[in-house]
A protein has these predicted regions:
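C-terminal motif of bacterial Sec signal peptides marking the signal peptidase cleavage site
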Residues: 4-7
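N-terminal amphipathic/basic membrane-interacting segments and domains
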Residues: 9-384
């Protein structure tokens, strides 16, 4: 019976501990995100502290005994006694994000593959680009026109918003692609330059074709080029079109993501070609913080050439926050900083949008995670 008692208690304690620690870590990070948006609004330094390790040691002790039963026959009746004690000793290691880790996680712009990964999770491209992109560069031959994602610059901001609304409308109709540009590299070499062993090695990496007239081999290799947002399947492009887009990509940075909207496909009433330049996480927090004050977003109508947008979803703000002197009663999570409570607004017509925006912010922070130094202990140990 004693062993059974200890065996039943330990799994229950473990389950509760795992869930409790998971909730605590998630809430702590969520509150840090809100606090740092508030810090950005007040032009205070942004700082994060990460939980690198949680170790919890559980001790279970059970005992048993017997005593005369009250009211018994002068001790002739014995009553068993069972008891036990439970002790928990948690150890939590926290590490401030600083130095080179701060530079890599918070100051380095997001690479294009991070945005593509989120697009494949079916996040709204409008939400993604409004939060992650600092500007759009529209190609107007022979140069680019730059439109910044800053509400303070009215003309730039409104063009930026119209471009991302156009992409969102294409996505709503399931006609938006975000795929690596398929490239084919071709080389022609004399047949006499290849020996038998070399020929076998080439066949492992290239498709090889022999031309008996010129006695040459043509080598072809398929590679994945830069990621491209389009309203058509990039695999259908001709070799010449792929080469043209690849030549343009030579001027792009790893934090740039290009788009090519063509006239003969859905959304083609407004053909455009250009590049979005992505922000760093530090810049995203600054953008959201400024939106609390004078740099708040505002309503921008879609372009007349843009197809209908699903449910006419077009919030003024990328993520709306509530600020109050008392704890907000309907907020999912809030944090107190400098005698004010900050929370994501989860009421009204854009409650879902705001929740999605905060979830996206949480994911973006997780996507910056590097290896956090860990103490050499297991996550949870159980001792009985």
């Amino acid at each position: 019976m004693v062993g059974l008692l200890a065996g039943c208690v330990s799994p229950i304690a473990l389950n509760r501990a795992v869930i409790a620690y998971d909730d605590a870590v998630t809430d702590a990070l969520s509150q840090q995100l809100l606090i740092n948006i508030a810090r950005a609004y007040h032009r205070q330094p942004i700082h994060f502290t990460g939980v690198s390790n949680i170790a919890a040691t559980f001790s279970f002790q059970a005992n048993a005994g017997a005593m005369p039963s009250p009211g018994g026959l002068a001790g002739a009746s014995i009553m068993p006694i069972f008891g036990g004690t439970f002790a928990e000793n948690p150890t939590i290691s926290i590490v401030p994000i600083e130095g080179e880790d701060f530079t890599q996680r918070l100051l380095t712009p997001f690479p294009q593959n991070k945005l593509t990964l989120l697009l494949r999770q079916r996040y709204d491209v409008d939400l993604l680009l409004r939060m992650m992109a600092q500007e759009v560069r529209l190609f107007q031959s022979p140069h680019y026109e730059i439109y910044r994602n800053s509400p303070r610059d009215t003309a730039n901001y409104e063009m930026f918003r119209r471009v991302v609304l156009h992409l969102s409308a294409i996505q709503d109709d399931n006609k938006l692609y975000a795929e690596p540009l398929p490239l084919i590299h071709t080389w022609t070499i004399p047949a006499r330059a290849i020996e038998a062993e070399g020929f076998q090695a080439l066949q492992k990496e290239f498709s090889v074709r022999h031309d008996p007239i010129s006695n040459t081999y043509t080598l072809r290799k398929h590679t994945a080029g830069p990621i491209l947002i389009t309203n058509y399947d990039p695999a259908l492009l001709s070799d010449e079109e792929r080469d043209q887009l690849n030549d343009m990509a030579d001027d792009w940075d790893v934090s740039d993501i290009a788009f090519d909207i063509r006239a003969d496909h859905y959304g083609g009433a407004w053909p455009m070609r250009g590049v979005f330049r992505l922000r760093s996480f530090h810049s995203i927090l600054g953008f959201l913080g400024k939106a609390i004050g004078a740099d708040a977003g505002y309503h921008v109508d879609k372009d007349v050439r843009t197809p209908p947008i699903l449910n006419d979803e077009n919030p003024d703000l990328t993520m709306e926050l509530e600020i109050s002197r008392i704890p907000p009663s309907e907020a999912d999570i809030s944090v107190r900083w400098n005698d004010r409570f900050y929370a994501v607004k989860t009421t009204g017509p854009y409650a879902r949008w705001n929740r999605d925006a905060f979830q996206l912010l949480f994911l973006l922070f997780q996507m910056t995670v590097t290896d956090i130094p860990r103490v050499g202990v297991p996550s949870i140990t159980i001792a009985k």
